[in-house]
Amino acid sequence: EWTRPIYFSTTVGSDYYMSLENNFQLEGLAYRIVPYGGKNGSFINTDIMYDKIMNDFRWGGMDKNPDMYLDETCRRMCSTLRSTFNQLASELIAEGKTEKAQKVLQKCIEVIPYSVAPYEIIMLYVADNFYKCNDEKNGDLVLNTLIKDYGESLIWSKKLGRYNMRTNYQENAYYSEEIQRSLL
């Protein structure tokens, strides 16, 4: 009898999962262990996750204070949260629920605004999902912001000089490939 659920945080390293990944059900920021397994590892209960993200979670007021300062740890958590939004949206799209997916993506850019937490690479996938939901306006907004930031990063890297520019080469090459891939 599974009367008391057991959860693992999504931020815990996979080394601690004790080979239970096939029995993980993603419900927001936690994996719930369930007695049945997914086909290829963990799976998402979109109904539970949608309700938690859209109604239960509190977002700390980032959307109300564009001057809020986030330290590096908080900015990394914003990336984790954006990834969670995107995972849910991807699964909703796969289920044919594009209207709900679009609402999830819209909430993502509203509650974790660019002004407080600049976009990172996960936002390419958010932009792609906006396009899959036929929301070209928001897809373009996110993608154009990423392209602008990437261009500014390249200009900054060039000013570092040839030797120091090499340290940023790998990251810049990765971003360039991902942006090109998203434009196809």
What are these regions (language model features)?
Residues E1-L184:
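ER/secretory pathway lumenal C-terminal domains and tails of membrane proteins involved
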